[in-house]
């Protein structure tokens, strides 16, 4: 009897040690992730180096965890992007001239607005891509104008509503799978469930998630109404002027022969991209904070149940 009790106590102790060790390891990684920079007096340069190394390790680990065919696809895409960048650097003048010629031709066609509208409408459905490129192309054709904004706004709003409706009613199971594709999508879903308002949806639409996938993922969140989603889409249309601005600066870059004007156009494009990235990053980190909070809450609940 005593031997049985000692064995049971020993096994329970081992389990408790394992559990404490597991939690300790998890807490260690949480500290390393969130509090490392606050624990040590690092300079700005050291902080930047640390962040770059940590991001590189995460990226490499994520890449190595992919199946072989996905790794090959990633390498192929990176190679294609590198070749495209080199071609753009070498033949940038002729490419810009060709782009300007095509944009002027498109502007003269009466049916060009319908082409842009339909293309933007259809890329709203996951897993299609090309939204940013199409909006920037509209800026090349129409510049920063009400006409250009109206075309891409109608395509964006109506396309997103259509994709949301289809995935909410017909492809609901696929929409729920989209949420589970990424931890950040799950955090997004949690935020929407807690705060079902068009303001929150509008803010989350500015996060750096793929445009079409976000339409499908939001449709998988219970309680989100088409009304609130539609209002949120309308509220986020002013940001589309940024794409038009970038497209118009690209066109000016090809048309201008002045070095000062070209420099101004390049700086304007960089500023616009930085502004978009900064806004998206702020909202992204807010979403990440929410995700970490949920993780801590789940861990506390798990500890309570095991206790």
Curated annotation (Swiss-Prot):
It is found in: Golgi apparatus membrane. It comes from the Eukaryota. Keywords: Golgi apparatus, Membrane, Transmembrane, Transmembrane helix. Residues 1-71, 135-143, 249-262 are lumenal. Residues 93-113, 165-227, 284-307 are cytoplasmic. Disulfide bonds: none annotated. Coiled coil: none annotated. The keyword Transmembrane helix applies. The chain crosses the membrane at residues 72-92, 114-134, 144-164, 228-248, 263-283. GO terms for biological process: mitotic spindle elongation; vesicle-mediated transport. Residues 139-250 are annotated as: VTT domain. Belongs to the TVP38/TMEM64 family. Golgi membrane protein involved in vesicular trafficking and spindle migration. The VTT domain was previously called the SNARE-assoc domain. As there is no evidence that this domain associates with SNARE proteins, it was renamed as VMP1, TMEM41, and TVP38 (VTT) domain. This is Golgi apparatus membrane protein TVP38. The gene is TVP38.
């Amino acid at each position: 009897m005593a031997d049985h009790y000692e064995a049971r106590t020993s096994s329970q102790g081992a389990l408790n040690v394992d559990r404490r060790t597991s939690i300790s390891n998890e807490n260690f990684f949480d500290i390393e992730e969130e509090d490392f920079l606050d624990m040590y007096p690092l300079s700005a340069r050291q902080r930047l180096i640390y962040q770059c190394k940590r991001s590189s390790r995460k990226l490499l680990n994520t890449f190595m965890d992919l199946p072989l065919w996905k790794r090959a696809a990633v390498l192929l895409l990176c190679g294609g992007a590198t070749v495209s960048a080199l071609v753009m650097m070498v033949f940038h003048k002729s490419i810009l001239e060709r782009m300007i010629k095509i944009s002027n031709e498109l502007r003269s066609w009466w049916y060009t607005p319908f082409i842009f509208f339909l293309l933007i409408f259809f890329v709203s459905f996951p897993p299609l891509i090309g939204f940013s490129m199409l909006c920037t192309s509209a800026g090349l054709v129409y510049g920063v104008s009400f006409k250009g904004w109206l075309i891409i706004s109608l395509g964006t709003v109506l396309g997103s509503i259509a994709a949301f409706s289809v995935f909410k009613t017909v492809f609901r199971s696929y929409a729920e799978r989209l949420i589970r594709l990424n931890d950040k999508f799950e955090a997004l879903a949690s935020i929407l469930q807690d705060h079902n308002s068009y303001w929150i949806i509008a803010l989350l639409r500015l996060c750096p998630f793929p445009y079409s996938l976000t339409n499908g993922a939001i449709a998988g969140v219970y309680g989100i109404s088409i009304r609130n989603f539609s209002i949120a889409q309308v509220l986020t249309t002013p940001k589309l002027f940024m794409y038009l601005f970038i497209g118009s600066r690209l066109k000016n870059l090809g048309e201008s022969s002045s070095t000062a004007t070209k420099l101004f156009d390049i700086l304007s494009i960089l500023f616009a991209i930085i502004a978009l990235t900064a806004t998206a990053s702020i909202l992204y980190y807010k979403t990440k904070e929410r995700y970490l909070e949920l993780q801590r809450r789940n861990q506390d609940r798990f500890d309570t149940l095991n206790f």
